[in-house]
Amino acid sequence: AFAAAAQAERGSDGEVRIIYWQAPSILNPYLSSGTKDLESASLALEPLARFDETGTMVPLLVDELPTVDNGGVSEDLTRITWKLTPGILWSDGTPLTSADVKFTADYCMHPEGGCAQNPKFENVASIETPDAQTVVINFDKPTPYPYAMFVGGETPILQQAQFQDCVGAKAPECTEANFNPIGTGPFVVTEFRPNDVITFEANQNYRDPSKPAFAKVLFKGGGDATAAGRAVMETGEYDYAWNLQLAPDVIAGMEAAGKGKAVAGFGPLMERIMLNNTNPDPALGPDERSVIRPHPFLSDPAVYKAMSLAIDRPLLVEIGYGKAGRVTCNWVPAPATYDSDTFDCSTQDIAGANKMLDDAGIVDTDGDGIREKDGVPLKILYQTSTNAVRQDFQALIKQWWSEIGIESELRNINASVFFGGDPGSPDTFQKFYADVEMYSNTFNGTDPQAYLGNALCDDAPRPDTQWQGQNVARFCSEEYDALHQELTQTANLEERARIAKALNDMVIEQGGMIPLVHRGRISAHANDLGGVKLNVWDSEIWAIADWHRIKE
């Protein structure tokens, strides 16, 4: 305890240097949705609560999170009451009050404001401030997840005194305020040069007198991911580098220099093979192709389960992602609360896959090496976007599937076309003119309700939706739709997690997709920088108040 106390002195560790290869342009999260801007602003501006590195909501400017159980959320889910922790000061020494919180909401909801975070303030009917520490937000309908606003770095509290003349159309004109926001966070902006560099110093009014350990932050922007990685891991010029989208061997080479290490953070991003639940036969007309159910053989559980069993996921992770990948069997691999433990897919089993197909009577009757189901050969068109890692995956998976009597034709499509959504193109992932297709998807925040809505029957792309819709597999289950409806009406977080896992399991078990790799985001920090906890649910550098220099 004595050693910790001796170290615990604000500003005692000097300067910390951060490099983001995308440079910040503004420090007001309500006027930008760029990660670089939101995260640099998070050193000064804070929300009422935030998400920790596991995706768990934790209080920040309040003592407890409002819930139905503690009376903070009304039984009918139309009201949430936040109680500010007493005694919190802005960096200019004035008190934080409920008026600042109400002002921030009004600032974003102003019809002429063009607020980047507007969707987070949906369904707000009114906001009351019965006293200086209490904020009551009333919704115009039951809202089981009332934490969209003021939770996380995208919706922090602005100081009313600083921004009161910057409302509506005037918001972007308030350069001084937008570049130098007064906050409650561990640091204060001392100079901001847009698209170049920001300097911060420790907030002398920060609520924890022993933090931050660093007196100054140099926040440099620009360059590219390679240069940023080198600046931390090879030259040691910087202490922290963000979002290193580099191949595993490149990162390993940088780490070998011995100055720093790469760290991976895992949100919900997941590489998967989607299974077409409809028939993509080119012989069908445009109103039926990839519209009518079922698929001639992919609808058979023996087929899609054998296809999954034949895949060596640990090898895919090693080849494609290194430490930025993990094996997953789930559509929703994170946050941990929602990660189902029903399936194990970490071991390839070619023999087991062959037996599964044999037992189902799906055998090769004509000796050409390809099995048939009801006379239809198991020949599949397997498409994805053009990308070196994806083509490696296709080649391996084609080989493994051939070992269980399934023949694949590989196709790769330019990413801008594949993901482009042009209803006139036959090559989009939504149109899905193939049997299986591979890509990644993810969702924002930590609540998967809307994401799980991507398997609802009526969300399938088809001609009368102009081929738009998120249910690309054309999965359809009345039981699933009913359970998802139940999720939208459930407030208890544990119960939401139980239902979400059940929905995840239904889509995997009933052949909506074959999950492959849970993908991460990589950053790097100096070996002597302590307290770093990479966060993919909130500002990545959310824990900077706890950063410190590790003493030799």
Pin down the residues of each PLM region.
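Extracytoplasmic/periplasmic ligand-capture domains
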Residues: 4-10, 50-53, 65, 70-71, ...
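Short N-terminal segments immediately surrounding and downstream of signal-peptide cleavage
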Residues: 8-22
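N-terminal lobe/hinge region of extracytoplasmic solute-binding protein
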Residues: 19-73, 106, 182-184
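Surface-exposed binding/hinge segments that line
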Residues: 117-167, 191-193
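Mature extracytoplasmic/periplasmic domains
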Residues: 166, 324-342, 522-524
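Active-site-proximal polar cores
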Residues: 516
